[in-house]
Regions:
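Short cysteine-rich clusters marking metal-coordination/redox-active sites
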Residues: 363-366, 381-384
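Short nucleic-acid-contacting surface segments enriched for D/E, G, S/T with interspersed K/R
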Residues: 310-326
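Flexible glycine-rich surface loops and low-complexity tracts that mediate binding to linear polymers
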Residues: 274-279, 321-337
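Long, charge-rich boundary regions
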Residues: 392-442
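OB-fold nucleic-acid-binding modules
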Residues: 233-280, 286, 315, 348-355
Length: 442
């Protein structure tokens, strides 16, 4: 028996397809050939800020054991399944497959981390493929080889979550999804906090169903396989489910965010965590988006809390100059219309600056609030006529509404990788030792 890791990526397009669906098909096909799975299919979300991603930027890895004589058939089946289900007609879809037969080396783990947190080049992936005797297959420019190799290298031995994904029958794809909304809300109430991001609490919007033409009916995310399977069993679908699979994933783990020491280290397209003081008061621009600038001793950068971020936007609006914060988010490159900007996913307030208001002094004779006679000309009292050029405005410290702590964008606008509040304190430190029995259908 040999161990085999099969990584693949970039099969979908905005019009159709889903790389997880290719994985779901292969789960059944590889079982039929005689392979046994050593892990749930791994769904690895890569850097969400790369400009060439299709939709969710998710790569897949299937980890199996099989007899050596089955390897060729498994490889042929994988290549055929990817080719038949990828949208090769779309200009931005460039599928890639990697077959890896060794234990996962540190070099590959490092490559995976860099692919999740930054930008890597094809030549780096191909160098590793050659170095470790892997085999790679690319369609068109084969960019999916990068994601496929990264999915193999990310073994999810630290924090991870699970997602059960259900798929529609071919005849229903492209039509409105038919699921009983009340059953989703019931599922949410019964399974929280072991599942997360099912229903947006601010708007009551259902979050488990995608809106595009892809084959997914719904996906439920949670802390363990039993929780997501139980949640799936509560949901009442009003259309047939073709198949479903439980994936192990880096969803909701903040795996993409990399802490940097200085604003000067910021690079376009990289997700970062960086500390800085507010340089000036936040500005609300057309559309309701809130923009503010943070600075440190080495530079400054704009931060944007867009209108859909909900709670985060409201928090950003209440910040003042001098507040010390950590900004979490992806870096948008500069353009002719705006500078380099961090698109915010989270804000951690570390220190609140005092908010000071200045008032005219009260008259020392009659206690009425005095009026200014002009810049540096002193004050006069309209009631008793007293005047003074020596009195100064009185500083009053106002109570801040904001509190120190972590603030996260509303659930409806959280990215796949963003760790929600519910998950703090639930981080995992090890991969699972065994799998549940029925983790896919058929």
């Amino acid at each position: 028996m040999i161990t085999m890791h099969i990584g693949f990526d970039d099969t979908d397009s905005p019009k159709m397809g889903c790389t997880t669906y290719v994985a779901a098909l292969l789960v059944v096909k590889l079982h039929q050939i005689g392979a046994s799975f050593t892990d749930y299919p791994n769904l690895i979300r890569l850097n969400p800020n790369v400009p060439w991603k299709t939709r969710g930027n998710g790569a897949l890895c299937l980890r199996i054991r099989c007899n050596e004589e089955l390897v060729e058939e498994i490889m042929e089946t994988t290549i055929d399944t990817v080719e038949k289900n990828a949208d090769l007609s779309y200009a931005g879809t460039d599928p890639g497959i990697v077959f890896f037969f060794n234990n996962i080396p540190d070099e590959l783990r490092t490559f995976a981390k860099r692919t999740i947190q930054g930008i890597v080049k094809m030549k780096e992936a191909l160098k590793l493929v050659k170095m470790f005797g892997a085999e790679a297959v690319g369609f068109k420019n084969g960019r999916g080889i990068i994601g496929g190799l990264a999915a193999i290298g990310e073994t999810l031995e630290k924090d991870h979550t699970y997602e059960v994904i259900t798929y529609r029958t071919p005849k229903n794809r492209g039509t409105p999804r038919r699921i009983q909304a009340s059953s989703i809300r019931e599922m949410n109430e019964k399974t929280l906090p072991l599942t997360f991001n099912n229903v947006d609490p601010e708007t009551d919007r259902i979050l488990i169903t995608p809106r595009g033409p892809d084959p997914i009916l719904y996906g439920i995310r949670g802390e363990n396989p039993k929780a997501v399977k139980q949640a799936h069993e509560i949901v009442h679908s009003q259309e047939p489910i073709e198949r479903w699979v439980i994936f192990r994933t880096n969803h909701g783990t903040d795996a993409h965010l990399r802490r940097i020491n200085s604003i000067s280290e910021i690079q376009p397209f990289n997700p970062v965590v960086v500390q800085g003081d507010l340089a000036k008061e936040p500005e609300v621009i057309p559309g309701g988006h809130v923009i503010f600038t943070i600075k440190d001793e080495n530079g400054k950068v704009d931060c944007a809390a867009y209108e859909p971020t909900g709670t985060l936007r409201k928090v950003a609006k209440k910040l003042i100059a001098g507040d010390l914060i950590e900004a979490y988010g992806g870096v948008r490159q500069a353009s002719s219309k705006h500078p380099v900007t961090i698109n915010l996913e989270k804000i951690r307030i570390l220190k609140l600056a005092p908010k000071i208001s200045f008032f005219n002094p009260k008259c020392p004779h009659c206690s009425k609030r005095m009026k200014s006679m002009g810049k540096e000309k002193g004050f006069r009292c309209d009631k008793c006529g007293f005047r003074s050029s020596k009195l100064k405005k009185v500083a009053v410290k106002n109570k801040r509404v904001l509190k120190k702590g972590l603030y996260i964008t509303s659930q409806r606008s959280q990215r796949h990788l963003t760790k929600p509040i519910l998950r703090y304190g639930r981080e995992k430190a090890n991969a699972p030792k065994k799998m549940i029995v029925n983790w896919h259908f058929p």
